[in-house]
Amino acid sequence: MVGPGPTAAAAVEERQRKLQEYLAAKGKLKSQNTKPYLKSKNNCQNQPPSKSTIRPKNDVTNHVVLPVKPKRSISIKLQPRPPNTAGSQKPKLEPPKLLGKRLTSECVSSNPYSKPSSKSFQQCEAGSSTTGELSRKPVGSLNIEQLKTTKQQLTDQGNGKCIDFMNNIHVENESLDNFLKETNKENLLDILTEPERKPDPKLYTRSKPKTDSYNQTKNSLVPKQALGKSSVNSAVLKDRVNKQFVGETQSRTFPVKSQQLSRGADLARPGVKPSRTVPSHFIRTLSKVQSSKKPVVKNIKDIKVNRSQYERPNETKIRSYPVTEQRVKHTKPRTYPSLLQGEYNNRHPNIKQDQKSSQVCIPQTSCVLQKSKAISQRPNLTVGRFNSAIPSTPSIRPNGTSGNKHNNNGFQQKAQTLDSKLKKAVPQNHFLNKTAPKTQADVTTVNGTQTNPNIKKKATAEDRRKQLEEWQKSKGKTYKRPPMELKTKRKVIKEMNISFWKSIEKEEEEKKAQLELSSKINNTLTECLNLIEGGVPSNEILNILSSIPEAEKFAKFWICKAKLLASKGTFDVIGLYEEAIKNGATPIQELRKVVLNILQDSNRTTEGITSDSLVAETSITSVEELAKKMESVKSCLSPKEREQVTATPRIAKAEQHNYPGIKLQIGPIPRINGMPEVQDMKFITPVRRSSRIERAVSRYPEMLQEHDLVVASLDELLEVEETKCFIFRRNEALPVTLGFQTPES
């Protein structure tokens, strides 16, 4: 490792030399865990020996006492990446934002075990030159100095991401080892004593992205093992460790700025979920509880917060941060269970320090420890360091999206390999990591207490309802209901029903009254008939009959009158019958029977009759003659009376055959081939017709009227129809022959 070079040329030379050493060490070393939270465990536990970065990491691992999974980091593809990282680091000589990321990546790359460590180491070399260039650029005196020192430290320490550059300390591999051991011890002591101290925001912020207190406890319990594992998985975990550690250091060093900057970084990084920033002491507490749960996610968020915090003073760093955040996002799903366990163990403050230092130590051990020291000494400079450390991890995952350009190529390859491995190994952890930072950020409060956001929302909804009700009551406001129209509608409906039923009742009452009246009249007329037969004087009976209202509509009235007249002597029976029909007497058939009996009475001729003409007429008159006379009177009668009069003789004739209401229908014979003589003949078919329909048929349309000719008797048939030959056709529904002989079929 080369001593810190303030100028860009010196930084470039140191970076190149570091790159060569790192590549040589990388050939021996295997990729460390890209998951920073796993790095803290695995790297600290078992760090595969490396030329420069591995030694301080091993020392840090010894200090942290986390020997667990050194093999994962080895399995990760870090060796092929050193050249890629070197190439990526060279183009990544960019403004302070790249520098911040490079610092992080350099610190991470300092640990050859992890891919991010190699990349970060290369980035540190490139970062040194870029730091010099950035120091030249007006990014801020503090930021330029921090970047320069970070470049030097990264070049010297490899694993010292930005802590040494904050102090402008160049530490070689041995110095990194010693410094990492010391810093790990110091950080462990600081974390054990004061896990919420601001100088340790790196660790706390790292644990914070881990998100869950129980995970933090696990981290505290397994930090040494996680460090050992992280040394094995240094390549895989280095990025995450760097991200987490850098995020922790940044958040701890600048609690307020980290929150504000995290907002800016989150806004600048649409892919990255914005984490809620809280003061450093709150971040520490949250990092303790939450880092163990979901270290990767919180590391991302912390990195975002730290980037945003430090990117505001150093806008160039902010640019580099979005890349690191993206990378961190990619690395989150790649978190290893060992790293998660290590971060779970971080719940204990002492173990948190070990774990954080170890996580950073595997790829970034010395750098992170130095960063923690530098942060405790110089919080402003630690901001730059943290910014630089943060981009290293994200640069590994985004694969040169927007972080350290120098490390983009190598980190992209590493990130790809790590992404595939981590996705396979820890898909659930990635999901938890993604979700964890949100929950942690939501759980974090100003008082540093953790609460469940879901419970808060439920409580707030209920409280809001209650408050709304109370407020409405206090203001005297009530919801106005529309006027109840149903009652009025119901009333209207009831009235309508009442009127309807009343009308029906009235009709029924009227009918009942009519029936009662008709029954009374019938009873009275029946008594009169009995009196006439009993020999009561006719004058008294006539007085009674004249006193009965509407008696003319009853046939019994006319029967009584006919009997009274017959008892006195001869009278015009047919005239009486015609008058009864005009008045609409019913039932007319009873009157007809009486009239026929009077006419047929032979005793009547023996009695004294003054007029010979009347005697001859009565003796010769028959029912058919009466019918003809009634037809002559039809012109004087109303339609109803006319129908009744016309029906009288027909019914009388039908009565001869005992088939009342039957008429004759004349219809044409269908044409038959070979029988032309049949065409002159017509069918006569007996049919039954309703008198009610006959009365109303005149009002029917033509389609409903009778199409064929219908006659009441044969005499009428001869008058109407000119056809001389008729064929009687039997009606199956009416088995009546009417005296015709049915042809045998």
Swiss-Prot record:
Enumerate the UniProt keywords alphabetically: Cytoplasm, Cytoskeleton, Intellectual disability, Isopeptide bond, Phosphoprotein, Ubl conjugation
PTM section of the record: Ubiquitinated by the anaphase promoting complex/cyclosome (APC/C).
Biased amino acid composition, Polar residues: 30-61, 121-133, 389-411
Q: Where is the composition biased (Basic and acidic residues)?
A: 192-203
Q: Does the keyword Ubl conjugation apply?
A: yes
Question: What is its subcellular localisation?
Answer: Cytoplasm, Cytoskeleton, Spindle pole
Q: Which GO terms describe its cellular component?
A: centrosome; cilium; cytosol; microtubule cytoskeleton; mitotic spindle; spindle pole
Q: Where is the composition biased (Low complexity)?
A: 109-120
Q: What is its main location?
A: cytoplasm
Write out the ranges of the annotated region (Disordered).
25-141, 192-217, 256-276, 385-411
Q: Does the keyword Cytoplasm apply?
A: yes
Residue positions where Phosphothreonine is found in the record:
T742
- The covalently linked position for Glycyl lysine isopeptide (Lys-Gly) (interchain with G-Cter in SUMO2), per the record, is K198
Q: What induces it?
A: Expression is cell-cycle dependent. Undetectable in interphase and prophase, strong expression at the spindle pole throughout metaphase to telophase.
Q: Please report, in chain numbering, the residue ranges of the motif KEN box.
A: 185-187
Residues that the record marks as modified (Phosphoserine) are: S745
**What remark about domains does the record contain?**
The KEN box is required for the association with the APC/C-Cdh1 complex, ubiquitination and degradation.
Per the UniProt record, the associated disease is: Filippi syndrome: A rare disorder characterized by microcephaly, pre- and postnatal growth failure, syndactyly, and distinctive facial features, including a broad nasal bridge and underdeveloped alae nasi. Some affected individuals have intellectual disability, seizures, undescended testicles in males, and teeth and hair abnormalities.
Report the protein's function: Microtubule-associated protein required for mitotic spindle formation and cell-cycle progression in neural progenitor cells.
Q: Which family does it belong to?
A: Belongs to the CKAP2 family.
Q: What is this protein called?
A: Cytoskeleton-associated protein 2-like
Q: Which organism is it from?
A: Homo sapiens
Specify the taxonomic lineage: Eukaryota, Metazoa, Chordata, Craniata, Vertebrata
What's the encoding gene here? CKAP2L
